Design a protein with these regions (language model features):
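Conserved C-terminal helix/tail region of periplasmic/extracytoplasmic solute-binding proteins
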Residues: 27-42, 370-397
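A ligand-binding cleft/hinge motif common to bilobed small-molecule-binding domains
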Residues: 117-122, 272, 277-300
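Short, polar/charged alpha-helical segment
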Residues: 44-54, 64-82, 290
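Gram-negative bacterial Sec-dependent N-terminal signal peptides
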Residues: 1-23
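N-terminal low-complexity, Pro/Thr/Ser-rich intrinsically disordered segments
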Residues: 25-52, 230-234
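Extracytoplasmic ligand-binding site segments that recognize negatively charged/polar headgroups
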Residues: 62-73, 84-98, 106-269
Length: 397
């Protein structure tokens, strides 16, 4: 897929262009007081940060994970600070933050967010969010996990199957199997038109056409031929040069009537439900593995899926610009990187901290993160090809 010309969205441009001198001065004063960006101190005085955080008394977080609720009691018990958490999808968080910021409304302190394409190409350049790295965890993170944003964990969208009703192993071994007639109406996933991470999953497949072509030949024993519908669709979209295997896969996949469901948990349970005869497969979050329940749900990842096991994306923590409680924000971020990681210490969620990941691999009997056959989301490619992808998706649907 031809990369679209680089541009900033109109909203992001307006965020910068319409900012008044008074607001800019106020923002710089906040940055200085909050100790972020160029005003970050050389060393972090955690006694002072904690004292100031207790004085602030509350911290508001927009969280991509509902598990943030599990930290409320323990954080308040330890620090006397109330967490006000909102479970909001990553893309909606950023839209909400942008609108509030433009309106001069500043209520959120921390964002817990997985939408790297918008974060890195809009929010961070526009200084809507600020990176903060607690010194206590810095040495356990790679440079890419510290900059441009702090990564708390690595998540993935993968394919699950019902292990109870497939005792001999996964019923498919290739992404191309999803295009076979026997799987018509039997593949579940969130709609890429409604779920940004589902769209990112598909876009990442589209960004790897050579691997998809090789996988087709391994699966069917012959070179791939393009459908007329794919050829016509490509001719109608100026940003796409020519047909490729990934586009052909998407066309055949959509023609095979996948079932779109809004809840990733519901998808997992519908796949793993043992009280059925002909279970579907499902594309959902790796960490849903924790939802297995003896005698009720039995679902497992298809580790050997060709050409990839899944698509991985980082989940980051950051301070919102003009956060009213910046010290409590710093304290919460450190907490979520340390003992407050516990709600996400589940199979399928890999901690960015090296020591914690090593413990997870041993405890959960899982492959290490680096040994998984995953394609990482390319934030720049996802961002600049988004409109091209949507045009293609609608043409092929």
């Amino acid at each position: 897929m031809k990369q679209l010309r680089k541009f900033k969205t109109l909203t992001a441009i307006c965020t910068i262009a319409l900012a008044s001198t008074n607001f800019a001065n106020a923002d710089e004063a906040w940055q200085r007081a909050a100790g972020v960006g160029e005003f970050a101190p050389a060393t972090q005085d955690w006694a002072a940060i904690e004292a100031a955080a207790r004085e602030e008394g509350t911290v508001t977080i927009y969280s991509v994970s509902s598990r943030i609720a599990k930290l409320v009691d323990s954080f308040q018990e330890r620090y006397g600070i109330e967490i006000v958490g909102y479970d909001i999808a990553s893309d909606l968080q950023l839209e909400k933050l942008r609108r509030e910021h433009n309106a001069g409304v500043h209520t959120v302190d921390v964002l817990f967010n997985s939408e790297s394409s918008i974060l890195l190409n809009e929010a961070l350049p526009a200084k809507l969010v600020w990176n903060f790295i607690p010194e206590s965890v810095s040495d356990e993170l790679t440079e890419s996990e510290k900059s441009p944003l702090l990564i708390q964990r690595h998540s993935s969208r993968i394919v699950y199957y019902n292990t109870m009703l497939n005792p001999n192993g996964a019923p498919i071994n290739s992404l191309w199997d999803m295009t076979r007639e026997e799987w018509s109406g039997r593949t579940l996933l969130p709609s890429p038109l409604e779920d940004s991470l589902s769209a990112n999953f598909i876009q990442t497949i589209l960004a790897n056409p050579e691997d998809m072509a090789a996988a087709y030949q391994r699966e069917f024993g012959e070179p791939l031929s393009y459908s007329e519908a794919v050829i016509e669709a490509v001719e109608n979209i100026a940003t796409i040069d020519k047909p490729n295997a990934s586009i052909e896969w998407l066309y055949r996949f959509l023609q095979n009537e996948p079932v779109f469901q809004g809840s990733t948990t519901k998808i997992f349970k519908n796949v793993g439900d043992i009280a059925q005869e002909n279970p579907p497969i499902g594309i959902t979050t790796f960490s849903k593995l924790r939802k297995n329940k003896k005698g009720v749900y039995a679902a497992g990842p298809i580790y050997d899926l060709d050409p990839i096991f899944g698509v991985t994306y980082p989940t980051a923590l950051m301070i919102a610009d003009m956060a009213p409680n910046p010290n409590a924000a710093k304290l919460l971020i450190r907490y979520m990187m340390e003992e407050g990681f516990s709600p996400w210490n589940e199979p399928g969620d890999y901690s960015a901290r090296e020591s914690v990941e090593a413990e997870q691999v041993k405890e959960f009997d899982l492959p290490s993160f680096e040994d998984l056959k995953l394609w990482p989301v390319d934030a720049e490619e996802i961002y600049y090809s988004k409109f091209s992808f949507l045009a293609l998706y609608l043409e092929l649907s």
